[in-house]
């Protein structure tokens, strides 16, 4: 069984037992969270697609860790003008362990 969930402005295909990295969620490590924005639920050949959400469907997950992705380096240059700008960014994430999918 799998589900398509929406969190942090992105969509993820998840199944029970998987670990995924999502945009940072304000939750403690070890805390169990319930994601109720489920866009689709599939079980073998059967697929239930919401309009836009599947009513009554939830995904339970446990927060495993918080962290930062690798650094992304931004370099801007204006040719012939002696203008250079360097910038870096590390996006924060939350790692989730998917426990169960209830449809």
UniProtKB/Swiss-Prot annotation:
Coiled coil: none
Keyword Cell membrane: no
InterPro entries noted in UniProt: bL21-like, bL21-like_sf, Ribosomal_bL21, Ribosomal_bL21_CS
Keywords: Ribonucleoprotein, Ribosomal protein, RNA-binding, rRNA-binding
GO BP annotations, alphabetical order: translation
Cellular component, GO annotation: cytoplasm; ribonucleoprotein complex; ribosome
GO MF entries: rRNA binding; structural constituent of ribosome
Assembly behavior: Part of the 50S ribosomal subunit. Contacts protein L20.
Family: Belongs to the bacterial ribosomal protein bL21 family.
Name this polypeptide is given: Large ribosomal subunit protein bL21
Organism of provenance: Acidovorax sp. (strain JS42)
């Amino acid at each position: 069984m799998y589900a398509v969930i929406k969190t942090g402005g992105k969509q993820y295909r998840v199944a029970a037992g998987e670990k995924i990295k999502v945009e940072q969620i304000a939750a403690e490590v070890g805390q169990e969270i319930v994601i109720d924005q489920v866009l689709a639920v599939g079980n073998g050949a059967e697929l239930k697609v919401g309009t836009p959400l599947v009513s009554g469907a939830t995904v339970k997950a446990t927060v495993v860790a918080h962290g930062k992705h690798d650094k992304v380096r931004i370099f801007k240059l204006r040719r012939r003008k002696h203008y250079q700008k360097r910038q870096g960014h590390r996006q924060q994430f939350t790692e989730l362990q998917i426990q169960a999918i209830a449809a």
